[in-house]
A protein has these predicted regions:
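N-terminal charged segments
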Residues: 1-79
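Conserved acetyl-CoA-binding loop-helix of GNAT-fold acetyltransferases
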Residues: 64-69, 170, 176-193, 211-216
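Conserved GNAT acetyl-CoA-binding A-motif
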Residues: 68-78, 191-202
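Conserved active-site alpha-helix within GNAT-family acetyltransferase domains
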Residues: 78-88, 181, 205-223, 231
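Short amphipathic alpha-helix that is part of the acyltransferase structural core
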Residues: 1-24, 91-128
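Glycine-rich acetyl-CoA-binding "A-motif" of GNAT/NAT acetyltransferases
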Residues: 44, 148-151, 209
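Hydrophobic alpha-helical segments and helix pairs
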Residues: 64-108
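A conserved beta-strand-loop-helix scaffold within acyl/acetyltransferase catalytic domains
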Residues: 129-139, 144-171
């Protein structure tokens, strides 16, 4: 490994070949056309990218990474940041799963009623990250009970090419019934049959119930992070 700045995306991929978790994080959040630089060393790994809005996003992973400058920075949870320069935003976890074992699962019904999904999310999951009309969405899955939409979620493909779940939501009257697990499992079957081999998932750190549900499906924890916003000087 090296501790000097690396400007070639392919070189970073090669250096991370023996660290699958760092490799997956980098592949998820650092598209080649937006990549700026990375620093790889035994005690940590960091990289920065240009975001769509022109700002800079960076990640700092491990016990003692080089913290690259960024308007928004995500670090391994527990890493101390200068509170005079950065404001804590949110803590979240990244999970991942291989889809092959879901290939024979009952397929998820795919929804095209975007108005219904929009109203559902506004009522039952207002903090959803992805909404109908988002160009990254591959499809919306759904579960119904006698015609009533009771669970929905999106499979999206990010600019890195990584496929992720987003906006998994259950009707407030139908929670704790395993519907999110069922929907995600069925959607993984759809993904596998369409040639998608791995799917990721981000969860707020405090959402213990959701994390337990996804772990029961088979999702593996890739990393635990805290995001920070750079304060105006």
């Amino acid at each position: 490994m090296t501790s000097s700045s690396i400007k070639e995306h392919q070189q970073v991929l090669a250096l991370l070949s023996d660290n699958p978790k760092y490799l997956e994080i980098f592949s998820t959040y650092a598209p080649a056309h937006k990549f700026i630089e990375a620093v790889v060393k035994p005690e940590g790994f960091s990289f920065s990218v240009n975001d769509e809005d022109g700002s800079r996003f960076s990640m700092a992973l491990g016990s003692d990474p080089v913290v690259l400058d960024g308007d928004e920075i995500a670090t391994s949870r527990g890493l101390q940041m200068d509170s005079q320069r950065y404001k804590t935003q949110v803590s979240w976890d990244l999970y991942s799963i291989v889809t092959e074992s879901f290939q024979t699962f009952e397929p998820a019904f795919e929804s095209s009623d975007y108005s219904e999904i929009d109203n559902f999310l506004k009522t039952h999951a207002r903090k959803s990250s992805v909404w109908p009309g988002n160009e990254e969405v591959l499809f919306w899955g759904e579960i119904r009970d006698q015609g009533l939409l009771v669970a929905t979620g999106a499979l999206v493909q990010w600019r890195t090419g990584q496929v992720m779940f987003a906006s998994i939501a259950t009707h407030s009257d139908y929670r704790s019934k395993g519907l999110a697990q069922k929907l995600v499992s069925q959607m993984l079957g759809n993904a596998s049959r369409s040639g998608i081999t791995r799917v990721g998932l981000g969860v707020f750190a405090e959402n213990a119930a959701a994390k337990r549900a996804y772990e029961k499906v088979g999702f593996a924890l890739i990393g635990e992070f805290t995001s920070y916003q750079k304060l105006s000087q």
